[in-house]
């Protein structure tokens, strides 16, 4: 399962990107879960609060908090997430390199470019062994391996529980 966040202050754009990604993922037989955010602050707060994403599609110029500031906050918590900027503003490209973006897509997004970018990003995610992935209560989770000290498994009422300690 690839966990994706989409963040843009234009609701129409987030809808188009989400629909496009779902079509592409279906064609490539890649299961995805998407969360949509309409400002960088809520996305950064979600990541700080424990939400983990493999790929973030992020606009740069947004009203409340721009994509570069949001990415800087996200990088403090998750150094490995792939950030793909989706923007109409090429002039911010050099400024954004401080947060190590994976790719840039220019608006309006061409589905062929999106598919190529998504495929390469998914290959990068699948080649990355830096996370322990598991499902619990129908939700997919990923924990950075560097944060895991040990695993402990207990049987309570027929179910298994895995504990993570930092």
Predicted regions and their residues:
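Short, well-ordered amphipathic alpha-helices
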Residues: 15-24, 43-44, 71
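A structural preference for long, well-packed, hydrophobic secondary-structure segments
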Residues: 3, 19, 36-42
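Conserved acidic segment of CheY-like receiver
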Residues: 2-21, 56
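Short hydrophobic/Thr-rich beta-strand motif most characteristic of the beta2 strand and flanking loop
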Residues: 25-39, 46
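CheY-like receiver
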Residues: 42-128
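Switch/coupling loops of ABC transporter nucleotide-binding domains
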Residues: 2, 32, 81
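Conserved SAM-binding loop
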Residues: 6, 36, 85-86
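Conserved binding/recognition cores within well-folded domains
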Residues: 116-166
């Amino acid at each position: 399962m690839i966990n994706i966040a989409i963040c843009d202050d234009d609701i129409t754009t987030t809808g188009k990107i989400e629909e496009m990604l779902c079509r592409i993922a279906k064609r490539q037989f890649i299961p995805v879960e998407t969360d949509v955010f309409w400002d960088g602050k809520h996305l950064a707060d979600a990541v700080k609060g424990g939400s983990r994403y493999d790929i973030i599609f992020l606009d740069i110029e947004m009203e409340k908090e721009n994509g570069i500031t949001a990415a800087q906050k996200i990088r403090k918590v998750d150094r490995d997430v792939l950030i793909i900027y989706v923007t109409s503003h090429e002039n911010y490209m050099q400024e954004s390199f401080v947060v190590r973006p994976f790719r840039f897509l220019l608006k309006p997004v061409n589905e062929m470019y999106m598919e190529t970018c998504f495929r390469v990003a998914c290959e990068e995610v699948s080649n990355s062994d830096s996370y322990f992935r598991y499902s619990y209560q129908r939700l997919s989770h990923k924990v950075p391996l560097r944060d895991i000290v040990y695993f402990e498994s207990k049987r309570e009422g027929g179910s298994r529980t895995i504990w993570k300690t930092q």
